[in-house]
């Protein structure tokens, strides 16, 4: 278990792919965040139960043991102030399974870029989008009219265009 001393907060990265965790760690630590890693949802929940220092959760949606959404629900039940960034390579499935993001949540497509990850975490940190044109198209938030959200509304028959 790592003991981060962050300038911008501590991010718990929960992903079953070691390479994704390593990439996120390298990007985030290089930009002033502390990082704790979990290989599955159960491990992430246990970390939050034993650490008061987690500020953000990066949650892979499709993990063994416990899916990312269930993990995030359990973690937010313990610590409602933790902000959640869902990451997945299957973005089309996200809004089919779960039509709404709630406050303090965002979504980022995998594979993500350095800029995409940093902007998504920054968005969660500030709680709003400062300049919508600065947010990459792959980031979806509860209050953004993104291509994924438009696709979802069209699929659900909510947007006839």
Ranges and model annotations:
Residues 39-43, 66-71:
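Acidic catalytic/metal-coordinating carboxylates
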Residues 128-161:
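CheY-like receiver
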Residues 22-30:
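Charged docking surfaces used in two-component/phosphorelay signaling
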Residues 46, 69-81, 96:
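Short amphipathic alpha-helix used as the core "switch/output" element in two-component signaling
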Residues 60, 88:
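Active-site residues of response regulator receiver
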Residues 37-56:
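Acidic, metal-coordinating helix/loop segments flanking the phosphotransfer/catalytic sites
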Residues 112-122, 133:
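C-terminal output helix
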Residues 63:
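Receiver (REC) domain active-site loop signature in two-component systems and cognate sites
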């Amino acid at each position: 278990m790592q003991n981060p001393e962050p300038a911008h907060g501590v991010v718990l990265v929960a992903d079953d792919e070691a390479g994704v965790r390593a990439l996120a760690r390298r990007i985030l630590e290089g930009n002033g965040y502390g990082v704790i890693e979990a290989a599955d949802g159960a491990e992430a929940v246990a970390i939050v139960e034993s650490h008061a220092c987690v500020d953000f959760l990066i949650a892979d949606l499709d993990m063994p043991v416990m899916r990312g959404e269930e993990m995030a629900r359990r973690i937010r039940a313990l610590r409602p102030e933790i902000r959640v960034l869902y990451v997945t390579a299957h973005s089309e499935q996200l809004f089919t399974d779960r039509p709404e993001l709630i406050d303090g949540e965002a979504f980022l497509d995998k594979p993500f870029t350095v800029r995409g990850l940093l902007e998504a975490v920054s968005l969660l940190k500030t709680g709003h989008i400062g300049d919508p044109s600065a947010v990459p198209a792959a980031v979806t938030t509860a209050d953004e009219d993104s291509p994924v959200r438009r696709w979802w509304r069209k699929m659900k028959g909510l947007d006839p265009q």
